[in-house]
Amino acid sequence: MEDLSMKRVIVITGATGTGKTTVSQYLNSHYEIPRIITHTTRPKRPGEVDGVDYYFETAESFPKNHYLEDVMYASYQYGSSYEGLDRAFEKADLVSIVLDTKGAQTYAEQLGEKAVVLFLTVGKSDILKDRLTSRGDETEMVNHRIRSKEYKRDLELPVALTGRATVIQNDDWLKTQRALDAFVSALRIQQQSVES
């Protein structure tokens, strides 16, 4: 049986546009922390690749997977599968996943100490709309998302994660990088102490 005691999932959460995917990419490129690939029924954005950015599903194929968590967001389904988690842990002991706050709570409940929550926020909400528009989302989709109850929910750190999540305000990318560097360093030290 494989020793799972050292394995950790960095659960990156926050409202859409706070930089969750950018943070996940930074962790991968600077620390070789692979991202758990999740499933969605939303259409691909320009440049996205099936099996790399998401597993792009249809309404018919989505329910055929085994999910640790899944959610409907802005009329599309999103979910992370047990198989995706296992595939990521085959690559590394420290992996990341991008989730909404509801999914982050589920991971924290289901995985306990193996789930390390990172909550991203910004100082001004108009930054979020600008980021959504600049990444190629259609204006109608952006407006739909920022009016959704899920978006409003994800702007705030859930009470269930208070005291458990590390909060990073992602207004200035250089400051965010420094905060992420300190976060990963502390996490690796913690993993090494479990190992010894």
Regions found by a protein language model. Give the residues of each.
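P-loop (Walker A) phosphate-binding loop of NTP-binding proteins
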Residues: 15
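ATP-binding Walker
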Residues: 18
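ATP-dependent small-molecule kinase phosphotransfer cores
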Residues: 40-95, 99
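Conserved phosphate-donor/acceptor-positioning beta-strand/loop module used by diverse small-molecule
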Residues: 96-100, 111-134
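Walker A/P-loop
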Residues: 21
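Small-molecule kinase domains that catalyze NTP-dependent phosphoryl transfer to phosphate-bearing small molecules
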Residues: 137-184, 194-196
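Post-Walker A helix-loop "phosphate-sensing" segment adjacent to the P-loop in P-loop NTPases
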Residues: 29-37
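Hydrophobic anchor at the beta1->P-loop junction of P-loop NTPases
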Residues: 12
